[in-house]
């Protein structure tokens, strides 16, 4: 660790986790042999599995579950509230107690391209690939390749060879 990181006491780090500079981690769990890039924030009640790569400038909000062997590209944004508002119905500024955190799950072996936005209550299936810049508004099936705004299925991965997906 270095002096440029903010890592709260309640963070659970696995073995051989590699942390870049300028990261914020609090109340989260990071699995073994995972690499966290620069300028990443991972909030409380989020978890990242083992052997993952979370690239720079990514925001992983509360309630996101990232399983093992997942790749997250640069600048990926996770959203955890379907109806965000600044104030309550009576005009008062919302507090943490006013927000409803909605869970998002990224299944084992999935890859999310740089600049993608993943909306709340989404499940990205095992080995799925989300194209760069996509906006994911609904669940992605396992082995699907999706892209666009909103993200749509382009095709499916045919088979796996030695633990790696064959895309074409």
Positions of PLM-derived features:
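A C-terminal cap/extension of S-adenosyl-L-methionine-dependent methyltransferases
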Residues: 132, 167-168
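Flexible, glycine/small-residue-enriched loop-and-beta-strand segment within the central core
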Residues: 1-9, 19-122, 150, 156-158, ...
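C-terminal/domain-terminus segments
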Residues: 122-139, 143-145
């Amino acid at each position: 660790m270095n002096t440029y990181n903010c890592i709260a006491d309640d963070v659970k780090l696995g073995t051989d986790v590699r942390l870049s500079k300028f990261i914020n981690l609090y109340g989260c769990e990071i699995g073994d042999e995972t690499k966290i890039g620069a300028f990443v924030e991972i909030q409380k009640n989020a978890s990242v599995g083992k052997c993952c790569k979370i690239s720079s400038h990514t925001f992983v909000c509360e309630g996101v579950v990232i399983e093992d062997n997942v790749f997250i590209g640069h600048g990926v944004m996770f959203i955890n509230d379907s109806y965000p508002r600044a104030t309550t119905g009576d005009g008062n500024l919302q507090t943490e107690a006013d927000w409803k955190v909605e869970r998002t799950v990224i299944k084992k072996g999935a890859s999310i391209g740089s600049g993608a936005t993943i909306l709340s209550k989404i499940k990205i299936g095992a080995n799925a690939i989300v194209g760069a810049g996509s906006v994911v508004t609904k669940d992605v099936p396992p082995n699907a390749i999706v892209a666009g705004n909103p993200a749509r299925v382009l095709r499916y991965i045919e088979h796996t060879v030695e633990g790696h997906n064959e895309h074409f």
